[in-house]
From Swiss-Prot:
It is found in: Cell inner membrane; Cytoplasm. It is a peripheral membrane protein. The keyword Aminoacyl-tRNA synthetase does not apply. Monomer and homodimer. Part of the essential Sec protein translocation apparatus which comprises SecA, SecYEG and auxiliary proteins SecDF-YajC and YidC. Belongs to the SecA family. Part of the Sec protein translocase complex. Interacts with the SecYEG preprotein conducting channel. Has a central role in coupling the hydrolysis of ATP to the transfer of proteins into and across the cell membrane, serving both as a receptor for the preprotein-SecB complex and as an ATP-driven molecular motor driving the stepwise translocation of polypeptide chains across the membrane. This is Protein translocase subunit SecA. Gene3D superfamilies: 3.10.450.50, Helical scaffold and wing domains of SecA (1.10.3060.10), P-loop containing nucleotide triphosphate hydrolases (3.40.50.300), SecA, preprotein cross-linking domain (3.90.1440.10). ATP binds at Q89, G107, E108, G109, K110, T111, D502. May bind 1 zinc ion per subunit. SUPFAM superfamilies: Helical scaffold and wing domains of SecA, P-loop containing nucleoside triphosphate hydrolases, Pre-protein crosslinking domain of SecA. Its EC number is 7.4.2.8. CDD domains: DEXDc_SecA, SF2_C_secA.
Amino acid sequence: MVSFGGIARKLFGSSNDRRVRSYQPNVAAINSIEEKTKALTDEQLAAKTVEFRALLAEGKTLDDILIPAFAVVREASRRVLGLRPFDVQLIGGMILHSNAIAEMKTGEGKTLVATLPVYLNALSGKGVHVVTVNDYLAQRDAATMGRVYGFLGMTTGVIVHGLSDEERRAAYACDITYATNNELGFDYLRDNMKYEKNQMVQRGHNFAIVDEVDSILVDEARTPLIISGPLDDRSELYNTIDAFIPLLAPSDYEIDEKQRSANFSEEGTEKLENLLRQAGLLKGNALYDIENVAIVHHINNALKAHKLFQRDKDYIVRNDEVVIIDEFTGRMMPGRRYSEGQHQALEAKEKVQIQPENQTLASITFQNYFRMYDKLAGMTGTAQTEAEEFGNIYNLDVIEVPTNLPIKRIDEDDEVYRTFDEKFKAIIEEILDAHKRGQPVLVGTTSIEKSELLAERMRKQGFNDFQVLNARYHEQEAYIVAQAGVPGAVTIATNMAGRGTDIQLGGNLDMRIERELGELEAGPERDARVQAIVEEIKELKQKALAAGGLYVIATERHESRRIDNQLRGRSGRQGDPGRSKFYLSLQDDLMRIFGSDRMDSMLTKLGLKEGEAIVHPWINKALERAQKKVEARNFDIRKNLLKYDDVLNDQRKVIFEQRLELMESTNISETVSDMRREVIEDLVEKHIPERAYAEQWDAVGLKTGVANILNLDLPIEEWFKEEGIGEDDIRERLTQAANAAFTEKAERFGDDIMHYVERSIVMQTLDHLWREHIVNLDHLRSVIGFRGYAQRDPLQEYKSEAFELFTGLLNNLREAVTAQLMRVELVQQAPAEPEPPLMQAHHLDPTTGEDDFAPIYQASEVIVSPENRNPEDPTTWGKVGRNEACPCGSGKKYKHCHGAFEQV
């Protein structure tokens, strides 16, 4: 039955169709001047950049010059790369320019599409950031597309891990900057911990195009970027509490897998109270008394560690460390640690060394970082399922770009079996059948455990001609992905590992050339071998096409339809044939959580025998409904977290703007004077209450406060005894005395030194209090949920109390700065530059799993010139580039020698 909505769409087209059609006149206009643009010489084409900038200076807008600018980029791409953007790619470029997300299928040339709006927006001179998910993609795209920009007279920079501040500053100063989302966020946080404006590396947030936008703005939205410093060791406490959990019976706690939550029952609470009392850890009489909030937090973490987190699914233990497994890619993330003590609870559970907790020095979520840009756009192959989230949180529309060639992939209905064993047996039969036909197969699993279980079963059947791609073997990842499209290849991959690389039928030409000919010098021999590889891949591609193209077999549905669509999208790129199929069982996580019992009884009634599967579109619809529920819940979680984070973000903006003003100022004497005046007003108000009699004035308290804060010994008791004296007189005398003392000190120091001292003390004090404030807000946020039991809105309570804490921070700042400045004295040595503490940065990287929890040092401490490196002492090598020759003298690249151990 066709719905009225379906009939309307057929008659008038969907809103997406209408939006795409609205760009057609511009496409036609660009095509109409193509021949004229082709007739230009290289010099004339490059000169167009100067011409466009002159038009902008005269008052023209970017939209006014879009048509000629896109035509120029298209022609430059054709001349430099041999690639001419198709009409649909022009549409993709216009979508990106109009602050929207372009959904483009795998292999449709997103990287080339980005050059069009990037060039256009870079003409403004304010800088454009192209955001990728890992260093490899940033370097690859900057090197390739930088040739087009360079041809047109524009500069291109790239930001990767390990660059010095000078290198970063130069890259950000370029017209176009390629960088990972992590590097951009960390640079922003580090910039706002600097003490001089000229030390900062970023120059603003004008326009960003985010590649794999769903991964960065959705998958990673719950995890903030954090720069932290170490706290005291509390490993004994973690071990003590961990020992309690095995003593509990199943009736002592409740587990909710859907909500990923764990709570203690009444019996469990009583048992824990006795255990804690015996250990001397319980304060007061009851576990949930306010003074036991920290202990409750530790106990809840321990329970989750034992009952919710599974080894080899959520994490693995490697080299005496608990290493997290990314739920989206199945990759190890050696750099990422769970926050709020959860990682320490897992370390206690696994009896490995417990690493100390870290205090947050600065943090920001990607949601709030990317919302700082004046203009934001994104590209991905899968965004429609999260369109509501992109619209609500980022104000970004999702527009599906038509493919250049029709998609020939066949997406078959799911096959549902009753047990894991039956499902795996059917999967292996299907893999072997496809392998015999010479059809390349990509098998997608949801965890390391499942991928290795499948691999083991295949080996038992005597089949070993396959590759496993997951967190345990990520070093081989690029090559495995490159070979996954070869006829007969069988690749078992955890989730969307290697997402940045296309699986090309016949093999990936660029990767094969780099791997096989990387060390070979340019010349006739290399050219001949390149040509041989090209011919071999052509032949292999024809065989793969004849066998039906890439066959994607999924062993389970993911919680998100988007991840399933990403997996399917690996097949059928650029009009190639392909096939995809999901094999499920009633024992799968998603099926089990969403009511497989009812389905099991239904299948039994229908007479389903062992080894048989049920295949029906209704099953697919039911599973999609379950996935939609999970997606809606996850969206609600992210939306709610953002509401809380917005409170911190508003305060962060105030602090960071204040720091920037301080850095830009050479003289803040007026600010310091205002602080001193307000401190005096607070002192007087505190000790001389409004409308109080003189006998009620607190002379002793005021004298003590003046001595402690203003460092002055004044006859306040005598003043109070004077006839007719009022609080205004007291305030005036205190102000005059403090100003006189400070003026005398300033004259002794001299203007330059005094201004330097004032700025240094204000900034260092502000930083110290801000760090304490972040910790206080974290603690407040962890307990504010309990206010809901009192019928009060936790969010409103959090906003109110966070505001009070922030007001307290500003009061403490005035008081602490005034106290320090009234006491500071010169010593006979050059003033030292204030230094930030030793810092560590970490954040989930769902594509690379690289260590982002590495210490951050000044580059001068990590970059060592080759002549100063001792080949036998790696501690003298400093930072070594991944593609540099290894300093040990082996002749290998660093990443294939000593560098191979960095991610282990």
